[in-house]
Design a protein with these regions (language model features):
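Ribokinase/PfkB-type carbohydrate-kinase core domain
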Residues: 1-10, 70-84, 96-229
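Substrate-binding N-lobe of the ribokinase-like
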Residues: 3-4, 24-91
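Conserved phosphate-binding/catalytic region of the ribokinase-like
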Residues: 4-5, 164, 195-294
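Short, conserved phosphate/pyrophosphate- and ester-handling motifs at nucleotide-, phospho-/glycolipid
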Residues: 48, 180, 246
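Hydrophobic residues at beta-strand termini and immediately following loops
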Residues: 58, 105, 232-233
Length: 294
């Protein structure tokens, strides 16, 4: 089975459960609080490992985040390439309303302190045909894409959170894009974000060698490449917390492809896994194991 390198964010999530998302000028009390492991990179690595893949996590944290390494190890994620020499780990302040919606404030911390020499040292351990999973919560993404491509890695990119500098990245070297309709419209500079077919066609045409996986909330998910277009409706589930839904989706889609499933099956398994995730509280801990999905 292919090795997977997830070079991404590692956050300490500080989660407040509230009646509703705080409004400007408003002060309210939470009815519960907890701290847990998170970050898109961490969540996606956890999803891949829980789906039964051979996954390696790389990134940077401070001593305050060492518990995250222990948790990842408990899910059989290899953590050898996580650097722990930063002062402060990334932080996420997460509000979760009673209807399961969330609002997130990020503080990058160590996530934007990854050096090119650290990246080079890590990439030495991976070779042609291995997967490189990236999100936009760390620095040097353009360097990672270029160096990963040089080594023949299969690059999967989730351009979230979207920033304008993404447009300067060597995106033509990406094999799989995981986007929602807003991110896809931003990449293609499509004005009408409600015209989902146009957005999907625009990003497919902009990157003809890539597979496009686009999620559209309650409209479900789409896969597009060449003349192939597949739609997967959502799977209804009670919504408790949507925090790691997208990360679960990406992890289980990639895991399904690596296991040999076709894109229709991969979309279904990814959607099913996300439905399980949103029915539970938390990020990494809410992601299901493979025996619940496949």
């Amino acid at each position: 089975m292919n090795k997977i390198l997830n070079y991404g964010s590692l956050n300490i999530d500080k989660i407040f459960s509230l009646d509703h998302i705080v409004k400007p000028g408003e002060t309210i009390s939470s009815y519960s609080y907890k701290s847990s492991a998170g970050g898109k990179g961490c969540n996606q690595a956890g999803a891949l490992a829980k789906a039964g893949c051979d996954v390696y996590m790389a990134g940077k944290m401070g001593p305050d985040g060492l518990f995250i390494i222990d948790l990842l190890k408990s899910y059989n994620v290899n953590t050898d390439y996580i650097k722990t020499n930063a002062k402060v780990s990334g932080q996420a302040l997460i509000q979760v309303s009673k209807d399961g919606q969330n609002s997130i404030i990020l503080s990058a911390g160590a996530n934007i302190e990854n050096t090119c020499s650290e990246i080079d040292e890590t990439l030495k351990h991976f070779s042609n045909g291995d997967f490189l999973i990236l999100q936009n919560e760390i620095n040097n993404i353009d360097y990672l894409i270029n160096k990963g491509y040089e080594k023949g890695l299969i690059i999967c990119f989730n351009p979230s959170p979207f920033t304008d500098n993404i447009l300067s990245f060597p995106l033509e070297k990406v094999s799989y894009f995981f986007v929602n309709e807003i991110e896809a419209a931003q990449i293609t500079k499509t004005n009408n974000t409600n015209d989902y077919d146009k957005i999907l066609n625009d990003i497919k045409n902009k990157f003809p060698s890539a597979s496009i996986i686009m999620t559209i909330g309650k409209q479900g998910a789409f896969y597009a490449k060449d003349n192939i277009k597949v739609h997967q409706p959502i799977i209804d589930a009670p919504v408790v917390d949507t925090t790691a839904a997208g990360d679960t989706f990406m992890g289980y889609f990639i895991a399904s492809i690596i296991k040999g499933y076709d894109v229709e099956e991969a979309l279904f398994f990814a959607t099913k896994a996300s439905a399980v995730t949103v029915s539970k509280s938390g990020a990494l801990v809410s992601i299901p194991f493979e025996d619940q999905i496949f």
